[in-house]
Amino acid sequence: MIIDAHNHPDWHGHDLARFLDNMKSYGIDKTWLLSWESPVDEYAPHYNYVSLSDAWGPIPFSRCLGYKERAPDKFVLGYAPDPRRPDAIDRLQAAIEIHGVQLYGELKLRMTYDNPDALRVFRFCGERRLPVTVHIDYEFDTGVKYPRPNWWYGGGIEAFERAVRACPGTTFVGHAPGFWAHISGDDQFDKVAYPKGKVLPGGKAVTMFRQCPNLYADLSAGSGLGALRRDPEFAKYFCLEFQDRLLYARDCFDNRHQEFLNSLGLPSEVLAKIYSQNATKLVAPQDR
């Protein structure tokens, strides 16, 4: 069994039919379908060309729900209302009770993730056993002033670490360049989005994995894949050490992640954990 633990509806030209065909082509049995709620001035305008945004953000929960309703056995439903909204917890609770939401994600906002409002939501997720998928990005100059000169999310790895430690009863799933750059102890994380070169000891993400049992990570997108591909020898040791807390995921529609994982020579029981067992452990998929 294979579970893609990070993807989105109507993403990069994929309507439901294309999405399901793509899953079938690569042997993917289920997908975690994540929303992205955000004020319009907190995401780059180019996302309007790769998703169907509305007043709630680039990837509305309504689109996730539409996919789930039409193919209930193929998707695990995620929803991440903006924690800064006064009704965030109420909306999430309603989505859980009415629609069977099982994930809180994707959280991708210009706020520090140790914000007290965010911590309240994270603790609620822990009580309801919803894993929390977060996107972290550092400031990189876009060359323009408007709508924003850069697109940072989360406040860096330190703010994320404080949140993870402040909410030990909540499972967090790290994702995106600002998380995966910290697989290495070098100083590239705030200089380039996708660092290259051998992984050096002392990476903050590795330290967090060893110290925070409630931290998981998905291998999605160029950031997760790139973190492994930059040093295949280290990638194998990393996957072996943290085999119980890594999730196969794509955030795209190609097969590069499977191809690379399968090339590492990992034991079949380790691949089984990464491909599906860890995801199933966090949220047992339900047909609704």
Which residue ranges define each predicted feature?
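A cross-domain feature marking catalytic cores of carbohydrate-active enzymes
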Residues: N7-P9, G13, S35-W36, Y79-P83, ...
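Mobile, glycine- and charge-enriched loop segments
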Residues: M1-G13, L65-Y67, D73-Y79, P213-Y216
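Mid-to-C-terminal alpha-helical segments outside catalytic/metal-binding sites
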Residues: M1-N7, H12-S38, Q93, Y237-L247, ...
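Active-site gating loops and adjacent loop-to-helix segments of metal-dependent hydrolytic enzymes
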Residues: Y26-A55, P72-K74, E139-V144, A176, ...
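Active-site gating/metal-coordination segments in enzymes
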Residues: A44-W152
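Catalytic pocket-lining loop regions of alpha/beta-barrel enzymes
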Residues: Q102-L103, N115-L247
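Acidic-and-aromatic substrate-binding clefts and catalytic sites of carbohydrate-active enzymes
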Residues: H8-A17, P39-D41, S53-G57, D82-A88, ...
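Alpha-helical scaffolding within the catalytic cores
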Residues: D15-F19, P58-G66, D87-L92, G156-E161, ...
